[in-house]
Amino acid sequence: CVGEVSAEVKQLLKTTKESLYKAILTAIPGKRLGDIGYAVQQHCESQGYGIVREFVGHGIGRTMHEDPQIPNYGKQGTGKQLKNGMCLAIEPMVTMKSPELYMLPDKWGVITRDKLPAAHFEHTIAIHHGKADILSTFEKKKKIEGHLY
């Protein structure tokens, strides 16, 4: 633990995490990429937060970052249609206020231009049997290990 955070930061974290799960619930066959982004955007912006637009979720497969790109904003019913067999990294990135970012001189670190906190949660999912299955959870690992011993 790195210390306590303010109630405002706790709410930012809670809202960002909630938006991740709302997006995951949206990721079913027949829906579209815009539906995922809309779920994140609507939930976060309705509470006054900003949505990072420079970084997005993505497909994942033989390589870490594959198409399609999955923005955390969007219009319902737009974008590529979701199908069984797709593996996606959904990763809401949400700011306390302004969504504008600044790249640090090291070309790795990124901060918000207004220097206020931001939050990022991520899960990798596989769409199959008509629903999104979360792959990046320790529950899955526990189930696999349980079968090994």
Locate the predicted segments by residue:
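Active-site neighborhoods and metal-handling regions in enzymes and metal-associated proteins
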Residues: 1-149
